[in-house]
Amino acid sequence: MIEENKHFEKKMQEYDASQIQVLEGLEAVRMRPGMYIGSTAKEGLHHLVWEIVDNSIDEALAGFASHIKVFIEADNSITVVDDGRGIPVDIQAKTGRPAVETVFTVLHAGGKFGGGGYKVSGGLHGVGSSVVNALSTQLDVRVYKNGQIHYQEFKRGAVVADLEVIGTTDVTGTTVHFTPDPEIFTETTQFDYSVLAKRIQELAFLNRGLKISITDKRSGMEQEEHFLYEGGIGSYVEFLNDKKDVIFETPIYTDGELEGIAVEVAMQYTTSYQETVMSFANNIHTHEGGTHEQGFRAALTRVINDYAKKNKILKENEDNLTGEDVREGLTAVISVKHPNPQFEGQTKTKLGNSEVVKITNRLFSEAFQRFLLENPQVARKIVEKGILASKARIAAKRAREVTRKKSGLEISNLPGKLADCSSNDANQNELFIVEGDSAGGSAKSGRNREFQAILPIRGKILNVEKATMDKILANEEIRSLFTAMGTGFGADFDVSKARYQKLVIMTDADVDGAHIRTLLLTLIYRFMRPVLEAGYVYIAQPPIYGVKVGSEIKEYIQPGIDQEDQLKTALEKYSIGRSKPTVQRYKGLGEMDDHQLWETTMDPENRLMARVTVDDAAEADKVFDMLMGDRVEPRRDFIEENAVYSTLDI
């Protein structure tokens, strides 16, 4: 025991000040980049652009910039130009260096602190410019200010030379050019134009009257777009509803400021059954909602009920409409600008400032009440839509209760058609939704029974985009899926209760299979979106061809853009001597026996699966509505623009 204590004492003595590492300047950023930009993959790479653009947006919010330009240069570097006041170039008192140098070399240096520079700002609260500098092989900045052009260059965060004047000018603004460091971004340094363009368009919607341009100068990829929306978030709502039938033409728009907090709301009702509410705080998309959404939702419900009762559209003895009722078919965008936003939630995308509830509630209530009084015909349409939604909700509740009595939604009594797995480990378990009883039989026989469950579905499930809640709950196939997953439904939905963390859609490789897949994805997106956002949803990729020599299949060809090239290569490969390979075309899963289905599509060692993600919720919402909604013309236009007529199932 004494010897052990001596050993322990020796170990303790070895841990002294010499073992404490102090990272100077921006070394910490290069050592742990994920702490500052989230990741070093594609998302983190594009985050660099937003940090610089956010600084330019701050100038626009302060009223000093009207045009921002973003360039993807020919060498895949980025240039951001604005016509603001230009970053200060005079000496910063604390560092004794020019302010522009301090901004790019010192963490938490910028005009976002103390309230003296920017009243409202977005981004990472001042760390942005220096972080981008630290994670770039080269960064240079040009400041157009006081009639002079000031220039400074940096390499991997370090100053190359002092700030110098390189010319004269009669304009003001800042130009930042940087090249991401491949030592940091090992996965990719290639910028995705569509990712940048979508966010830039969103920023233009959120900042009324600000022009933002994006230009791609890369060889063979040249393109440019210019975004300017005088209607601001009102234009955003019109954009979101572009392919939908609206109840009234012009979106309701209101803006106001209280206690230094600015609130904007735009909203419009459509004939659909889905709600689309998007919220932002200081231009940051608050995916998880927050106090601004709380204030808006409460005001919307209260004002509509008050109007309905006062105008006797709802009788005094009738129940009030719920929030769910009044939001059916609603498209709304809420944007707040706060001098000191507090973000919470799992991904820090939930606004937490408690005072925002009452401010949003009050500002929106006053404007919405006024709108309803001034537009009685539109007001009646809004209330009547809520009443119809209420009736459907009550019918759905009755259907749910009847179903529960029959144990249809009780996990203790799983669907009879479900072939469950033996494991209780949700992290390992997989649920395959299989088209047809024939393929379902092969899948049940071929699966690994320990962790793979099979749920066969018959034919095409209900198109939930066109259905009311009571009809959805009355559909046996949909009920079976909810019950099997164990997540509950509607207000009771809880993704943490998912019995499987892989939900695999496995359909035939033909037009009908694609349609069933789309119907299932629509259901999941509309009513099980947390499962999608958690990354649990996959699409199986069964082979489309088998290359046979004699009776033996030598190679399977997976579906894809290059499937015909793959097939041609395989045929050449096995055309040796007298052997003549033949091609077996798999139109249906039922054409494969259980061993083949396991080997090609279900075996984790060999299979190919596509994970379904939602990178752009607004775009996803538009596409689902267009593909699965009532209007035929937008759907036909989309198919004509995007169809690839390489193979036809006739």
Swiss-Prot record:
Presence of keyword DNA-binding: yes
GO biological process: DNA topological change; DNA-templated DNA replication
Keyword check for Transmembrane helix: no
Main location (coarse class): cytoplasm
Top-level taxon of the source organism: Bacteria
Site residues (Interaction with DNA), renumbered to this chain: K460, N463
Cofactor: Mg(2+); Mn(2+); Ca(2+)
Matching SUPFAM superfamilies: ATPase domain of HSP90 chaperone/DNA topoisomerase II/histidine kinase, Ribosomal protein S5 domain 2-like, Type II DNA topoisomerase
Entry keywords, A to Z: ATP-binding, Cytoplasm, DNA-binding, Isomerase, Magnesium, Metal-binding, Nucleotide-binding, Topoisomerase
Protein localization: Cytoplasm
Cellular component GO terms held in the UniProt record: chromosome; cytoplasm
UniProt domain Toprim: residue ranges: 429-543
PROSITE patterns reported for this sequence: TOPOISOMERASE_II, TOPRIM
GO molecular function (one): ATP binding
Pfam families: DNA_gyraseB (PF00204), DNA_gyraseB_C (PF00986), HATPase_c (PF02518), Toprim (PF01751)
Note in the entry: Few gyrases are as efficient as E.coli at forming negative supercoils. Not all organisms have 2 type II topoisomerases; in organisms with a single type II topoisomerase this enzyme also has to decatenate newly replicated chromosomes.
Assembly, per entry: Heterotetramer, composed of two GyrA and two GyrB chains. In the heterotetramer, GyrA contains the active site tyrosine that forms a transient covalent intermediate with DNA, while GyrB binds cofactors and catalyzes ATP hydrolysis.
Protein name: DNA gyrase subunit B
Species this protein is from: Streptococcus pyogenes serotype M1
